[in-house]
Amino acid sequence: MLGVCYYPEHWPRERWSEDARRMRELGLAYVRVGEFAWALLEPEPGRLDWAWLDEAVAVLAQAGLKVVLGTPTATPPKWLVDRYPEILPVDREGRRRRFGGRRHYCFSSPVYHEETRRIVTLLGERYGKHPAVAGFQTDNEYGCHGTVRCYCERCQDAFRKWLEERYGSIDVLNEAWGTVFWSQRYRTFQEVELPNLTVAEANPSHLLDYYRFASEQVRRYNRLQVEILRAHAPGKFVTHNFMGFFTDLNPFPLGEDLDFASWDSYPLGFTDLMPLPEEEKLRYARTGHPDVAAFHHDLYRAVGRGRFWVMEQQPGPVNWAPHNPNPAPGMVRLWTWEALANGAEVVSYFRWRQVPFAQEQMHAGLHRPDYAPDAAFFEVQRVVEELGALSLPPPGQAPVALVYDPEAPWVYEVQPHGAEWNYLALVFLFYSVARRLGLDVDIVPPGAALQGYRLVLVPSLPIVREKALNAFREADGIVLFGPRSGSKNENFHIPQGLPPGPLQALLPLKVVRVESLPPGLREEVEGPWGRFSSGLWREWVETDLSPLLRFADGLGALFRAGRYLYLAAWPSPELLGALLVGLAQEGGLSPKPLPSGLRLRWRGHLVFAFNYGPEEVVLPVPSGVRFRLGGPRLSPYEVAVWEEG
């Protein structure tokens, strides 16, 4: 099903009925409203104005549309900030942020918690049983604009309480943090400050705990809203719209409190911000990298425990990236179909109409500011027609699992040990190489059940907890661990028995030395799959295992013990591709290298093909297959669907 984000408060009331009618005629089903409207709902303290929202919901309902109502807490009004200036967050440099944008509040503010409780309760009481309201979105894009981590006095107080609950005694904290180093020892929890503005780098254990605390504060705040909505809106769903390539927040605990996850898909903006080779950025500037959207579909499907929406789908040029090109013709349709192929229940476009004023006036919509349909409108029309002729079976489990660790970016941000070390880049490399081989991938958190997967990819898992170790033990497929796995314990220490720490129960080896390399310095790696290169990171390993790959100096780069493998370097795409081909074949899969812009996705008995490239491609299908969409020759930016077997 399809939907759209709509801001009735931006347009004359006499326009609302026409907009709603056209939404329904287009074939849309859901409309998100209200997530930035606090100042209109409560223009003065305690004076509520529901009339405009009542009317907007009624107009949409009359057209047969279902409403997703956003709680308006991402934008506290000016009067609230003036009354309680302490709700404003403080940045890492100790500067208090000001009113005038959005997300201008601290997650630890008791006052803001109470104001949130009040406005969300009022919203739930008024609309929780409204027949046209299908569900609620809490807030909007938690953490956007660097707002997960605040450094105000309330955060300091809350962090001290969090530490006391976690450690129990200050002596335990001192031991866990290694405060004997640099004379950092604390006598009480009240002496612990936030880990910013230090002269030299802060203690890494201190930093990691603060990042954990800050993420948990977001969950605590979100849970406050969810519990209110559950009480006042029985039977209505509750979701939140997460972001792409955003690592300050661990989304999995939040997902446990939601009915399903949502995320905001902007493939062109994300591609422009990614650390990609320049030629790749240019090749995919108008389409997005072929794996950017799919990666997040798979991630947030896992966060939503099998269910997710795309709450905001890019419809044209955005306004916030360094460069904002126009999507190639057909890409809005392709992105929509790709989301559905990956299991999205709803794809909702942002926004119905481009707004002619304020911060997002250069962000395209399905309509131009002069009310005329924009290019994406006609692509959505085509999707609606195609959806009417194609029944989508339930998604199934992929043959490959990729373990994504939300704490790993924090660990490597605290102590990267190499300027180019980037956890997301390594994870994306593993994901993308697997997809280039025509393999479907499920993203799972550490500790998730791994039964049924033929191949499990663990690009890097710095902290290996018992639950994750047990899941690896119980996996019935081949498991490949990447560099720096098991390199730290829970407290950010090097494991007593050296890395890979607990993984030594599966792989009898020790990492005794590591190095980070500048981008131009490469290491040759050779083995049964050929000669390749690695870079950025290398490890020295002590073991009685015979290496499957060796560096040029003869030392091992890849080791295997039974179903488990350990890769002691950051691989090139060619090296990783050759390795995954061999492991996938051993696992009973049939990897097939695809043309550079082509990607496949299975949904039940249907196979979807997406051509992100500027060249026509011939699809890898046997003769006689039944195509439900397209055909065996796929033009640039086109979609094909066929039935398998």
Swiss-Prot record:
GO terms for molecular function: beta-galactosidase activity; metal ion binding. It catalyses: Hydrolysis of terminal non-reducing beta-D-galactose residues in beta-D-galactosides. GO terms for biological process: galactose metabolic process. The active site is at residues 141, 312. Substrate binds at residues 102, 140, 320, 360-363. Zn(2+) binds at residues 106, 150, 152, 155. InterPro entries: Beta_galactosidase_C, Beta_galactosidase_Trimer, Class_I_gatase-like, Glyco_hydro_42, Glyco_hydro_42_N, Glyco_hydro_b, Glycoside_hydrolase_SF. Its EC number is 3.2.1.23. It comes from the Bacteria. This is Beta-galactosidase BgaT. It comes from Thermus brockianus.
